[in-house]
Amino acid sequence: MIRNNWTLEEALELFRMPFSDLILKAHSVHVQNFRNNEVQVAALMNIKTGSCPENCRYCAQSAHYNTGLEKKSLSTVEEVKTAAKRAKEIGADRFCFAAAWRNLHDRDLEKICQFVEAIKSEGLESCASLGMLKLDQAQKLKESGLDFYNHNVDTSREFYHNVVTTRTYEERLETVRNVQQAGIKVCCGGILGMGESTEDRASMLVTLANLEQHPLSVPINRLVPIEGTPMEGNPKIDNIDFVRTIAVARIMMPASYVRLAAGRGEMSEEMQALCMLAGANSIFCGEKLLTTPNARPEDDQRLFSQLGITPSRAACTTSDAQLA
């Protein structure tokens, strides 16, 4: 059952469940809403690297920190098309692209729409992560055929000031609402391991589950500490705590894809299998996610074979504009 009225205490009660009971409950919810043993596979490209004016304390691309990152200007349409073809070859059915900037500028909008069209021409779903977005920009992206827009809340409203101060929590939610109003599917999740408490994790999931519409994709990132950022020395989140968060996300947002995102490259096969048992049913493929390492395609193929998992197929690979 889809709910949009979760309380913090209800979410915390799920986190407090005995681990085996929680996993059993989450898996039961999962198989009621998705085909068991299917995982959606997405690829991610950085179309503009570095010099971001935001001060997100975890991010290698922030201009506020000296991380030694090589900066790169906006990609060309041909570069995006080539990357999309490669993503399809290694098994992706969704191609996501992200830019290190605060918000989408109108001067770049037409080129971004061309990126979407190039991706769709390869028979892939498209997803963009371009920072804050105005309603009219979202509508233009919808017209170009964009399927998904990613804009994470990162953490709880209460802990947020410890993560970033150049963008408010409400500004993040406003972008999510603009995307939903334009009719684009939302991809929205957060990052674990930034020093937040269990209550913060529960609060973040309550925020997501109480949106007017649940995000169709919920990426759960495991912090990859980057040298030169304020969070470079953060201890890694406990594996069981991470899996618990996956399970609670699955229960609270039963029809959403729960994605293992950043940090998966450092997870053992057993850890990934446990996450999938708890309800994770989407991954990023490719050896790099923006600026952090990811699992190799051959490792993913071996894992899928060991677990008897098959990639799911995209449901919207044709532009809505083409269908009109």
Swiss-Prot record:
Pfam families assigned to the protein according to its UniProt record, in alphabetical order: BATS, Radical_SAM
Pathway terms, separated by semicolons: Cofactor biosynthesis; biotin biosynthesis; biotin from 7,8-diaminononanoate: step 2/2
EC number: 2.8.1.6
Domain Radical SAM core: 37-264
Subunit structure: Homodimer.
Positions bound to [2Fe-2S] cluster: 96, 127, 187, 259
GO molecular function, one term: 4 iron, 4 sulfur cluster binding
Cystine connections: none
Cofactor note: Binds 1 [4Fe-4S] cluster. The cluster is coordinated with 3 cysteines and an exchangeable S-adenosyl-L-methionine.
EC class: transferase
Function, as annotated: Catalyzes the conversion of dethiobiotin (DTB) to biotin by the insertion of a sulfur atom into dethiobiotin via a radical-based mechanism.
Organism: Anaplasma marginale (strain Florida)
Protein name: Biotin synthase
GO biological process, one term: biotin biosynthetic process
Binding residues for [4Fe-4S] cluster: 52, 56, 59
The family this protein is said to belong to: Belongs to the radical SAM superfamily. Biotin synthase family.
Superkingdom of source: Bacteria
Co-factor requirement: [4Fe-4S] cluster; [2Fe-2S] cluster
UniProt KW keywords: 2Fe-2S, 4Fe-4S, Biotin biosynthesis, Iron, Iron-sulfur, Metal-binding, S-adenosyl-L-methionine, Transferase
Entry-linked NCBIfam families: bioB
